[in-house]
Amino acid sequence: MAAAATAGPGAGAGVPGAGGGGGAREGARVAVLCLLWYALSAGGNVVNKVILSAFPFPVTVSLCHILALCAGLPPLLRAWRVPPAPPVSGPGPGPHPASGPLLPPRFYPRYVLPLAFGKYFASVSAHVSIWKVPVSYAHTVKATMPIWVVLLSRIIMKEKQSTKVYLSLVPIISGVLLATVTELSFDVWGLVSALAATLCFSLQNIFSKKVLRDSRIHHLRLLNILGCHAVFFMIPTWVLVDLSTFLVSSDLAYVSQWPWTLLLLAVSGFCNFAQNVIAFSILNLISPLSYSVANATKRIMVITVSLIMLRNPVTSTNVLGMMTAILGVFLYNKTKYDANQQARRHLLPISTSDLSSREHLRSPVEKPHNGALFPQQGDFQYRNILLTDHFQYSRQGHPNSYALSRHDV
């Protein structure tokens, strides 16, 4: 897995001039990674449902996921030689490694702690939803994330969208409503938890993009920081909610099943960590638009596998609602991709005079922090090829100061 992920930035884009054999190998590598991604995601969701059906402690499952993230990312960051701090400008060609702190101190109370709390709350809410409702329905509700992103971006960041973007939300709304009214195993708390998790993920998306843009820290490094800080929110909740129940419960069924439960929890944590890393590898190898297609296909696979393996009852109308919502997510991604490409073309100079006339439009740079420059709100956001709807899938345009510059979690 790591070998595939460390193919290098050149492999990610499909190097021009590569022979037919190289293209075939690249296609085979993407196909294998996509199959692994689908299998880990679908298998992880099925395992989570199996665990929570017999072991109804969603906080424990969330804690295992956070701990797997904290344990797995540091060796991965060292293996991929991701710098601990953003690259800085200096004499000589190219960026230079930085040895300062990961983020400026002001970022921690303003962004890191709220984002870590959001990660904790979103993880717990997501597992509560899987506990209360079928996996297929929970993933259908998660398809509402573009709606939350558009609304919150308009309210918080004052970002306006095109008419096409707003119209692309209609199939998502219609599909989720149709799936909700026809869901045979509907539970109000399951719906509320799934919506709360999606809302938290959307807020994470907005503010994580801001941190990534303003600090230029590697997003895997930021994910590691958020995971480690989320543990401080997760452990007190686990002690108060789950551990206290373990200590006072008179039901010894949990004790007799501990070996099997612990094995499933370990498998769940590994699947969650591995699918994030493989998703990172896939976006290094394909275009963002192809990735959005692969991501929509993954959601279809998760829903299909969960319906087959868990055998929860569904109707044809219910399935139609699920597929409509997922199609809406793909249409939204395609519309956003086209809008970002158009904005990017508008920023590219046509001639030398255009370049000179636009030079004064560049945003000023904040005061250096330990030698690292942190750009403000100017044109840096348009250097991204595509910003999709989840922090896991946001791509940044960092300099090639380390092996993996085109990235995704």
From Swiss-Prot:
Location in or out of the cell: Membrane
SUPFAM superfamilies: Multidrug resistance efflux transporter EmrE (SSF103481)
TM annotation in the entry: 50-70, 111-131, 133-153, 165-184, 188-207, 222-242, 252-274, 282-303, 312-332
Membrane is among the record's keywords: yes
Sites bearing Phosphoserine, chain numbering: S363
Principal subcellular localization: membrane
GO cellular component, one term: membrane
Keywords: Membrane, Phosphoprotein, Transmembrane, Transmembrane helix, Transport
Membrane topology: Multi-pass membrane protein
Protein function: Putative transporter.
Family note: Belongs to the TPT transporter family. SLC35E subfamily.
Name the UniProt record assigns to this protein: Solute carrier family 35 member E1
Species for this entry: Mus musculus
Gene from which this protein is expressed: Slc35e1
